[in-house]
Amino acid sequence: MCRIAGAPRTLLPLLAALLQASVEASGEIALCKTGFPEDVYSAVLSKDVHEGQPLLNVKFSNCNGKRKVQYESSEPADFKVDEDGMVYAVRSFPLSSEHAKFLIYAQDKETQEKWQVAVKLSLKPTLPEESVKESTEVEEIVFPRQLGKHSGHLQRQKRDWVIPPINLPENSRGPFPQELVRIRSDRDKNLSLRYSVTGPGADQPPTGIFIINPISGQLSVTKPLDREQIARFHLRAHAVDINGNQVENPIDIVINVIDMNDNRPEFLHQVWNGTVPEGSKPGTYVMTVTAIDADDPNALNGMLRYRILSQAPSTPSPNMFTINNETGDIITVAAGLDREKVQQYTLIIQATDMEGNPTYGLSNTATAIITVTDVNDNPPEFTAMTFYGEVPENRVDVIVANLTVTDKDQPHTPAWNAVYRISGGDPTGRFAIQTDPNSNDGLVTVVKPIDFETNRMFVLTVAAENQVPLAKGIQHPPQSTATVSVTVIDVNENPYFAPNPKIIRQEEGLHAGTMLTTFTAQDPDRYMQQNIRYTKLSDPANWLKIDPVNGQITTIAILDRESPNVKNNIYNATFLASDNGIPPMSGTGTLQIYLLDINDNAPQVLPQEAETCETPDPNSINITALDYDIDPNAGPFAFDLPLSPVNIKRNWTITRLNGDFAQLNLKIKFLEAGIYEVPIIITDSGNPPKSNISILRVKVCQCDSNGDCTDVDRIVGAGLGTGAIIAILLCIIILLILVLMFVVWMKRRDKERQAKQLLIDPEDDVRDNILKYDEEGGGEEDQDYDLSQLQQPDTVEPDAIKPVGIRRMDERPIHAEPQYPVRSAAPHPGDIGDFINEGLKAADNDPTAPPYDSLLVFDYEGSGSTAGSLSSLNSSSSGGEQDYDYLNDWGPRFKKLADMYGGGDD
């Protein structure tokens, strides 16, 4: 390869492109011959050929590029040829002389013209192992002599030997065990020695690889070694006498495993993916492929070189890419990448060790798929110069036309997506264009209503461009233009009233049959001959009617401003106008009648009921007037009393306070309590004025000093009736009964609690030798006892300090017993006298009561009791010689008692 001295590295891609252009130009001038350019294709292979292994590439010259050639092998069972001329192994086989030569046929599918070429395969020779020294002579390693005494003289020790490592090639074929070296001590002449080796590969994992003859010291290897597993072994040799005493210091032996080219390069990925933009210049980086070799990377066995075996497709040039043979970087070397023509390239990449030596190196292949990415080098183009559409008038959100464009760029990318805009013909903005994201079409849509009577047709100028600008250097205009002709279709429109609403002013009180106004509608369809008829749609008070032909509105009742259907002096009525088109359409209009007030309502007294005291002092009645008319037909008002009956003016007097209020007072000093109806004449200020006699109901009652009524009727009038009073009393009685029942229940519970304190709680009786019974039999025969001695000690001195908790009454307290004076006091309500009497009564009346000699339970009764010893407990002999074995027959409940008195062990 020649090199231009002094050329900067930045000019190398340019020089490569110029060189390629010159080569292509010269190739076009030279005469092209269709067929195989070589007579024989040869390849050097290893002995074992694997299935699918690429062997070589046969080139076929297709001058015009239009021939469709089909390849065929003369040995189809062993070899096949791909469309790009790459020869593959169909099956795995060892390479021999029968596979050394075969033919490749190429045939034109259209003309049936046929060509052939010979292929010769040769076996790769075995790499000579000059570095491995195989000698029949076994090297001897002697232990270095130590410092010691010999014949009474000191001898000088030699310096430590530097024992060179032993080089052993991997994958040796033996025979095994294979002798490596002999280890010997110079003392073996005088002593019987034993030799051994230690370390990984000997007595440590992996064990058994190296062995030594203990007598001769011969070190041997027992199996082939693999450098990729262990590249170096470090052993130590030992020499001892027959008693196991160390004779020599251990020496180190290093065994290096020499690498052989026994591993093919392996790509990190079998398929590599990369991208390159279309239109990229030569020298553009694409991707990097990487392979690894398990052999020694510092030797030729692990030094890899890359190359491109094939490129598919081969357009526009069969060498669009190149690869750096050392780094694996793939770059472009030719111009003309066009995604619209070729979207993807497939490269077969080969990695070979031995620095790429095709004779001795091992190879492997991988696939590099390079995708040509899109750039915006094609603007959108309309498929037609003019598009047509139509739309009914007054319709919005209607698609009137679909604008179609073509774009050769990659679909659904910013370089393909079209953006439409209206550049002319729509000054009022009645149309808009949206892009269909799936089809990329432009949808012309009406966004504002269109009136046929105003515009019958629109001619729009539209433009389309991509979302991103065109790439630099593209010789196309950035946008495409077209026209859209939109026809407006006339439809039957609704009639409309004008003005709407229509407001008129009329006085109230107009008689029926009065013509108010003419309320007509207009038909916007000027080019349609249609008639309009009118009907009443809404008339809350039913005061109006409309002529169906001319729209005259006439009253059918008297208009009253004070009607509840009149709001803020305005009465609303709605009318409907319908045409006879197809389909018929209608419109509504509202007539608002502003009613002017007239003095047609007499004033009334307010309030209509009042109360006052029997005497003129201390209060009066304030009154006013209510008039449904408005000014000037309302206040100020004039208040007066009628002349008859005569007692009205005799008993009452009225005083005007201002134009709206007056005050009614008693004229006499006393008026009997009761209800009186006082007529009052009220006159408004209308023209002419309107008067009215209004009745005021006055309640005269007895009053207190504050002027408030004090009779019962006032309570009733306040809203508290007899039923409510009875209900309140019943609730109070029920509440008192509940409180009383609760008090009784609490007292009864306290009494029961005091009675239960006299009994022994079964849970508190933890003694195993005494059982508590509810019935105590006949009790004591001696009935002469003092009940005062049976009172509880707590009842004698209530102020005494009581211990915390519940004290058992049937056991002696553990603290010092207080001395209580003997006194004949009346039995305390809390004593147990009643309890004993009830027990005696039950025993006398019950013939089945237990005998007197039964076990009884007594509560602790305090000291100072006058009662003697309990005869029922002393009736039996207290001697210890009695037989208590019968207690064992009483069952498990008496087991503890039987153990205590029956002479048990425990």
Curated annotation (Swiss-Prot):
<dbReference type="InterPro" id="IPR039808">
    <property type="entry name" value="Cadherin"/>
</dbReference>
<dbReference type="GO" id="GO:0000902">
    <property type="term" value="P:cell morphogenesis"/>
</dbReference>
<dbReference type="GO" id="GO:0014704">
    <property type="term" value="C:intercalated disc"/>
</dbReference>
<feature type="modified residue" description="Phosphoserine">
    <location>
        <position position="96"/>
    </location>
</feature>
<dbReference type="InterPro" id="IPR014868">
    <property type="entry name" value="Cadherin_pro_dom"/>
</dbReference>
<dbReference type="GO" id="GO:0048787">
    <property type="term" value="C:presynaptic active zone membrane"/>
</dbReference>
<keyword id="KW-0597">Phosphoprotein</keyword>
<feature type="glycosylation site" description="N-linked (GlcNAc...) asparagine">
    <location>
        <position position="572"/>
    </location>
</feature>
<feature type="modified residue" description="Phosphoserine">
    <location>
        <position position="135"/>
    </location>
</feature>
<feature type="topological domain" description="Extracellular">
    <location>
        <begin position="160"/>
        <end position="724"/>
    </location>
</feature>
<dbReference type="GO" id="GO:0099634">
    <property type="term" value="C:postsynaptic specialization membrane"/>
</dbReference>
<feature type="glycosylation site" description="N-linked (GlcNAc...) asparagine">
    <location>
        <position position="325"/>
    </location>
</feature>
<feature type="domain" description="Cadherin 1">
    <location>
        <begin position="160"/>
        <end position="267"/>
    </location>
</feature>
<feature type="binding site">
    <location>
        <position position="260"/>
    </location>
    <ligand>
        <name>Ca(2+) 2</name>
    </ligand>
</feature>
<feature type="binding site">
    <location>
        <position position="259"/>
    </location>
    <ligand>
        <name>Ca(2+) 2</name>
    </ligand>
</feature>
<dbReference type="GO" id="GO:0016477">
    <property type="term" value="P:cell migration"/>
</dbReference>
<dbReference type="GO" id="GO:0010001">
    <property type="term" value="P:glial cell differentiation"/>
</dbReference>
<dbReference type="GO" id="GO:0042383">
    <property type="term" value="C:sarcolemma"/>
</dbReference>
<keyword id="KW-0165">Cleavage on pair of basic residues</keyword>
<dbReference type="Pfam" id="PF01049">
    <property type="entry name" value="CADH_Y-type_LIR"/>
</dbReference>
<keyword id="KW-0812">Transmembrane</keyword>
<dbReference type="GO" id="GO:0009986">
    <property type="term" value="C:cell surface"/>
</dbReference>
<protein>
    <recommendedName>
        <fullName>Cadherin-2</fullName>
    </recommendedName>
</protein>
<keyword id="KW-0325">Glycoprotein</keyword>
<feature type="binding site">
    <location>
        <position position="262"/>
    </location>
    <ligand>
        <name>Ca(2+) 2</name>
    </ligand>
</feature>
<feature type="region of interest" description="Disordered">
    <location>
        <begin position="863"/>
        <end position="884"/>
    </location>
</feature>
<feature type="binding site">
    <location>
        <position position="295"/>
    </location>
    <ligand>
        <name>Ca(2+) 2</name>
    </ligand>
</feature>
<feature type="glycosylation site" description="N-linked (GlcNAc...) asparagine">
    <location>
        <position position="190"/>
    </location>
</feature>
<feature type="binding site">
    <location>
        <position position="261"/>
    </location>
    <ligand>
        <name>Ca(2+) 3</name>
    </ligand>
</feature>
<keyword id="KW-0479">Metal-binding</keyword>
<feature type="binding site">
    <location>
        <position position="353"/>
    </location>
    <ligand>
        <name>Ca(2+) 3</name>
    </ligand>
</feature>
<dbReference type="GO" id="GO:0007043">
    <property type="term" value="P:cell-cell junction assembly"/>
</dbReference>
<dbReference type="GO" id="GO:0005911">
    <property type="term" value="C:cell-cell junction"/>
</dbReference>
<feature type="domain" description="Cadherin 4">
    <location>
        <begin position="498"/>
        <end position="603"/>
    </location>
</feature>
<feature type="glycosylation site" description="N-linked (GlcNAc...) asparagine">
    <location>
        <position position="622"/>
    </location>
</feature>
<dbReference type="GO" id="GO:0034332">
    <property type="term" value="P:adherens junction organization"/>
</dbReference>
<feature type="binding site">
    <location>
        <position position="263"/>
    </location>
    <ligand>
        <name>Ca(2+) 3</name>
    </ligand>
</feature>
<dbReference type="GO" id="GO:0097091">
    <property type="term" value="P:synaptic vesicle clustering"/>
</dbReference>
<keyword id="KW-1003">Cell membrane</keyword>
<keyword id="KW-0472">Membrane</keyword>
<dbReference type="GO" id="GO:0097150">
    <property type="term" value="P:neuronal stem cell population maintenance"/>
</dbReference>
<dbReference type="GO" id="GO:0003323">
    <property type="term" value="P:type B pancreatic cell development"/>
</dbReference>
